[in-house]
């Protein structure tokens, strides 16, 4: 088996995790108590969903996941929620005091006390796998736990499981919406370690997802639940090929191979289509070509950056539902002829496609309509650099005055780490610039298409 272990860190990671496991359970017909009436083989079995769930002798399906937070409130919601019987109590790890939005607390003082316990639990899950494929790590880099403890865990995982791939689903701070003042510090410090210790990182950004909810689902005031359900559809589409059998399967390591041209250039944009509400879906049936086009719309991107400002290096399209390879090839052919979607000149083909015959599932009472087919796109585009330059700019404004730095130094960090991390990100922006630079071609012809 090719198992995947999910690690959910901090409030964002856990709440996105809740949405994902809720969706996985619905997709596989697993009840909130872990029983699965449709599963005939008792014990492990070779069923595809065993990549994400392990099975006990009593026929209970347990997610291969760990939830970690430095304070108990968010995990207590899991402990008392609908899916409380799904998880083994040891999988839910919580501390006593939180990281207080401080990277240094999450990484050094408080995170240090809990990290060995986490690794121990992860080790138990890993021992339970026959062929561990890698880790999916969910966190946000704006807070203290997601950024600090998240980086610490990733660093330790690199030591213990060097060759296993690590896929990050990372919530980045939004341009306008901010939940804390020191977000830029935490993000820069955390990205510094994401650069080294994840193989692929998929950037998510609340503001972009708010806008999608408002625009496409007509939700005037989206809640985190609305956001997370949308994100969980993306993550479900990515992992569908591991959990179901399909026509063109895509493995986690395949993402890496196809999307990452250079080790540092591994921050991806994601988009999902169709995002339509139930009342709209009633009147339109979306073809493969239409959903493919809308996946490339800048407005569909789940991070606030405009892919028209950059060039694509590679794209991964994961279709699910009633889709045949012929339609996919036609849709991709059309995309390639569009002048607005530009690829770097050194990567002419740039498309990796996966098809899964399992149609997308929707959460009952959720916002998304039940559709016959959907597509999720993960793309590596040079425009991602916008996200970093925005955070770097905010970092510089604060760091020039050394504002708030004493909170970090007081928790055992050194000021040098700030400048080291900041230089690393400056280098990353430069890398993106060079990757997008043409081989001697001029850049004047971009104006007229839009």
From Swiss-Prot:
It catalyses: GTP + H2O = GDP + phosphate + H(+). Belongs to the tubulin family. Its cofactor is Mg(2+). Keywords: Acetylation, Cytoplasm, Cytoskeleton, GTP-binding, Hydrolase, Magnesium, Metal-binding, Microtubule, Nucleotide-binding, Phosphoprotein. Residues 430-450 are annotated as: Disordered. Tubulin is the major constituent of microtubules, a cylinder consisting of laterally associated linear protofilaments composed of alpha- and beta-tubulin heterodimers. Microtubules grow by the addition of GTP-tubulin dimers to the microtubule end, where a stabilizing cap forms. Below the cap, tubulin dimers are in GDP-bound state, owing to GTPase activity of alpha-tubulin. GTP binds at residues 11, 71, 144-145, 179, 206, 228. GO terms for molecular function: GTP binding; hydrolase activity; metal ion binding; structural constituent of cytoskeleton. Undergoes a tyrosination/detyrosination cycle, the cyclic removal and re-addition of a C-terminal tyrosine residue by the enzymes tubulin tyrosine carboxypeptidase (TTCP) and tubulin tyrosine ligase (TTL), respectively. Acetylation of alpha chains at Lys-40 stabilizes microtubules and affects affinity and processivity of microtubule motors. This modification has a role in multiple cellular functions, ranging from cell motility, cell cycle progression or cell differentiation to intracellular trafficking and signaling. The active site is at 254. Its EC number is 3.6.5.-. The modification Phosphothreonine is found at residue 349. SMART domains: Tubulin (SM00864), Tubulin_C (SM00865). There are six genes coding for alpha-tubulin. The keyword Cytoplasm applies. Its main location: cytoplasm. GO terms for biological process: cellular response to gravity; microtubule cytoskeleton organization. It comes from the Eukaryota. Mg(2+) binds at residue 71. It comes from Arabidopsis thaliana. This is Tubulin alpha-6 chain. The keyword Magnesium applies. GO terms for cellular component: cytosol; microtubule; nucleolus; plant-type cell wall; plasma membrane; plasmodesma; tubulin complex; vacuole. Dimer of alpha and beta chains. A typical microtubule is a hollow water-filled tube with an outer diameter of 25 nm and an inner diameter of 15 nM. Alpha-beta heterodimers associate head-to-tail to form protofilaments running lengthwise along the microtubule wall with the beta-tubulin subunit facing the microtubule plus end conferring a structural polarity. Microtubules usually have 13 protofilaments but different protofilament numbers can be found in some organisms and specialized cells. Interacts with TFCB. Residues 431-450 have a biased composition (Acidic residues). Signal peptide: none annotated.
């Amino acid at each position: 088996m090719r198992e995947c272990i999910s690690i959910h860190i901090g409030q964002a990671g856990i709440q996105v995790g809740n949405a994902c496991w809720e969706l996985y359970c619905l997709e596989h017909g697993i009840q909130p108590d872990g029983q699965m009436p449709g599963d005939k083989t008792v014990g492990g079995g070779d069923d595809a969903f065993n990549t994400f769930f392990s099975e006990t002798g009593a026929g209970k399906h347990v997610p291969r996941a760990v939830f970690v937070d430095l304070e108990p409130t968010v995990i207590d919601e899991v402990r008392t929620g609908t899916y409380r019987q799904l998880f083994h109590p040891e999988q839910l790890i919580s501390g006593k005091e939180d990281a207080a939005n401080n990277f240094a607390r999450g990484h050094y003082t408080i995170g240090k006390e809990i990290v060995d316990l986490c690794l121990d639990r992860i080790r138990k899950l890993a021992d339970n796998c026959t062929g561990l494929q890698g880790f999916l790590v969910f966190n946000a880099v704006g807070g203290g736990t997601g950024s600090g403890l998240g980086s610490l865990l990733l660093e330790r995982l690199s030591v213990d499981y060097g060759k296993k791939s690590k896929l990050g689903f990372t919530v980045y701070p939004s341009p306008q919406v901010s939940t804390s003042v020191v977000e830029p510090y935490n993000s820069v410090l955390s990205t510094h370690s994401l650069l080294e210790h994840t193989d692929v990182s998929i950037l998510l950004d609340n503001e972009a997802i708010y806008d999608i909810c408002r625009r496409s689902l007509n939700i005037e005031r989206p809640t985190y639940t609305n956001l997370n359900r949308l994100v969980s559809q993306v993550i479900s589409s990515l992992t569908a090929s591991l959990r179901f059998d399909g026509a063109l399967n895509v493995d986690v390591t395949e993402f890496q191979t196809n999307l990452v041209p250079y080790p540092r250039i591994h921050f991806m944009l994601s988009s999902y289509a169709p995002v339509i509400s139930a009342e709209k879906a009633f009147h339109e049936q979306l073809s493969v070509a239409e959903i493919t086009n809308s996946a490339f719309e800048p407005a569909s991107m789940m991070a606030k950056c405009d892919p028209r400002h950059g060039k694509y290096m590679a794209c991964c399209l994961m279709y699910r539902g009633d889709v045949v390879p012929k339609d996919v090839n036609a849709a991709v052919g059309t995309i390639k002829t569009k002048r607005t979607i530009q690829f770097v000149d050194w990567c002419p083909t740039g498309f990796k496609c996966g098809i899964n015959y399992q149609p997308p599932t929707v959460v009952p009472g959720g916002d998304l309509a039940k559709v016959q087919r959907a597509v999720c796109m993960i793309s590596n585009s040079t425009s991602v650099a916008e996200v970093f330059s925005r955070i770097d700019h905010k970092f510089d404004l604060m760091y020039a005055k050394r504002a708030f730095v004493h909170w970090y130094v007081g928790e055992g960090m050194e000021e040098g780490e700030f400048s080291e991390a900041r230089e690393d990100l400056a280098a990353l922006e430069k890398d993106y610039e060079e990757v997008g630079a043409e081989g001697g071609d001029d850049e004047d012809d971009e104006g007229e298409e839009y």
